[in-house]
């Protein structure tokens, strides 16, 4: 059974009858939804969510958010049970996703959350029951 036939069956059940014109109209509406949900915003959002989909990266951004100030990369080592290389790699991924900023201060690199990173954490914190 094609997806169009299935849609027609659904519309018939829901509306008590459905012709080809109603199916075509509904397909147009669904295509508009698909166009609005896709595109560059979808790719960017998936990139951000991918950056958060790792325990080390998520813990780093939570630490930065709670700290409310810049932290040096060396300050994460005592808090995380991963290598310094893994911490640096995680911070780079969070920076590329636009969730943290990096600033060089002499020989040290300091990181802090961006407004977007903070907003995502506030939203996640607010969604817990």
Swiss-Prot record:
Keywords: Arsenical resistance, DNA-binding, Plasmid, Repressor, Transcription, Transcription regulation. Coiled coil: none annotated. Residues 73-96 bind DNA. It holds the Pfam family HTH_5. It comes from the Archaea. The keyword rRNA processing does not apply. It comes from Halobacterium salinarum (strain ATCC 700922 / JCM 11081 / NRC-1) (Halobacterium halobium). Disruption phenotype: Deletion of the arsADRC operon results in increased sensitivity to arsenite and antimonite but not arsenate. This is Putative arsenical resistance operon repressor ArsR. Gene3D superfamilies: Winged helix-like DNA-binding domain superfamily/Winged helix DNA-binding domain (1.10.10.10). NCBIfam families: HTH_metalloreg.
């Amino acid at each position: 059974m094609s997806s169009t036939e299935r849609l027609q069956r659904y519309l018939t059940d829901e509306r008590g009858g459905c012709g080809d014109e109603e199916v075509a109209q509904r397909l147009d509406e669904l295509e508009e939804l698909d166009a609005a949900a896709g595109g560059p915003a979808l790719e960017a959002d998936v990139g951000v969510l991918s950056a958060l989909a790792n325990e080390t990266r998520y813990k780093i951004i939570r630490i930065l958010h709670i700290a409310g100030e810049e932290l040096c990369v060396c300050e994460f080592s005592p808090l995380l049970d991963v290598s310094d290389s893994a911490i640096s790699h995680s911070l780079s991924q969070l920076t590329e996703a636009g969730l943290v900023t990096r600033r060089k201060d002499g020989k040290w690199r300091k990181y802090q959350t961006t407004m977007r990173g903070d907003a995502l954490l506030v939203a996640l914190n607010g969604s817990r029951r």
